[in-house]
Amino acid sequence: MTTILVTGSNKGLGREAVRRLLEHGHDVWLAARDAEAGARIAAELGARFVQLDVTDDASVVAAVATVGRLDVLINNAGIAGSHAEVADLTAADVQAVLDTNVLGVVRVTRAFLPLLLGAESGVIVNVASGLGSQGATHDPSRVESHVVAPAYCSSKSAVVMLTTQYAQALPALRINVVDPGYTATDLNGNQGTQTVTEGTDARGAMALVGLDGPTGTFTDRSGTVPW
């Protein structure tokens, strides 16, 4: 049985990913900062729960000790951050987004790496966005080209590059990054055109690749996403 941990998974895309992975018979840890909400949702779904705040080193280390064994890590936790106009955006606004969306990936990956390297087929799936794609944000035909969100977009671009660097440095693991697509979640006021089920297709597929599977790729449910 594959043991999978999904960060930030007490709602939205993370919750749906947990639900679908459980449906396919996997052993899934629902990880969330909010212990009360996380434990409640985990019980509803039939998942195991671990409290994990991706911005807190001690919380991450404690989660590793609780989990003990892991095959697949899905770095899903993320925030939209401030909606301030660009001229009013502060360094603190950007730092808050980077701390969760980028440094959170680094903290969690570093802490769980020994478990993943000890697995028969260790996998990491990082959740980015088309808003982190140079190609998508410069293509007038795509919705991403009409979004101005410097902190969020730059954070997701960083996640894409982090993924390719991890993939190069850790060839024993399969490490990929996915774009959920424009999905209806609270991050966009539920304005997205995809369902959360559609938004979890790519991460579900990449979570279950074997040793002969791809690594260092950027995909969505339709295929390759432009860098």
Regions flagged by a language model, labelled:
Residues V50-A62, A91:
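The beta1-alpha1 cofactor-binding region of Rossmann-like NAD(H)/NADP(H)-dependent oxidoreductases
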